[in-house]
From Swiss-Prot:
It holds the Pfam family Ribosomal_S5_C. Gene3D superfamilies: 3.30.160.20, 3.30.230.10. Residues 12-75 form the S5 DRBM domain. This is Small ribosomal subunit protein uS5. The N-terminal domain interacts with the head of the 30S subunit; the C-terminal domain interacts with the body and contacts protein S4. The interaction surface between S4 and S5 is involved in control of translational fidelity. The keyword rRNA-binding applies.
Length: 167
């Protein structure tokens, strides 16, 4: 069970990744609604995403930001990158995340770049496989980020010392 992260104790920035116009055809014509996908993060190891739907764009964004603040995760960061390579999946989308050398920057496109920058990961390489819709990309990225573990956690799970793990 992931521990709750209080969004009120963090200085969160938000970034709108996608806005979709949804049309429902009814007897009297078309009903328009908007769906927004938003990423929030403190650029210091905490990031979340949320979606919101409403009749107007600003209201959809507000709902998405609220949802994102309730859906925060902690990302383990080693220096300026992630601890190890990981493959996140959601639906038909896959995201491969690899640690990168310091100074190489975020090599990722669109939604994945946004997640990494708001999480505070400065150096990472990614490859998007399969479905490339923004929602699938974000959810697959979050799946990958939740799989990340620090060396201390791995050593504790295996019941060995950190020195033994390094060898």
């Amino acid at each position: 069970m992931a521990k709750f992260i209080d969004p009120d104790k963090l200085e969160l920035e938000d970034n709108v990744v996608a806005i979709n116009r949804i049309t429902k055809v009814v007897k009297g014509g078309r009903r328009l609604r908007f769906a927004a996908l938003v990423i929030v993060g403190d650029k210091n190891g905490h990031v979340g995403f949320g979606t919101g739907k409403a009749q107007e764009v600003p209201e959809a964004i507000r709902k998405a930001v609220e949802a994102a603040r309730k859906n925060l995760i902690e990302v383990p960061i080693v220096g300026t990158t992630i601890p190890h390579e990981v493959l996140g999946t959601f639906g038909g989308g896959k995201i491969m995340l690899k640690p990168a050398a310091e100074g190489s920057g975020v090599t990722a496109g669109g939604a994945v770049r946004s997640v990494m920058e708001l999480a505070g990961v400065a150096d990472v390489t990614s490859k998007r496989l399969g479905s490339n819709t923004p929602v699938n990309a974000v959810r697959a990225t979050f799946d990958g980020l939740t799989q990340l573990k620090r060396a201390e956690e791995v050593a504790a799970l295996r019941g060995v010392s950190l020195q033994h793990l390094a060898e």
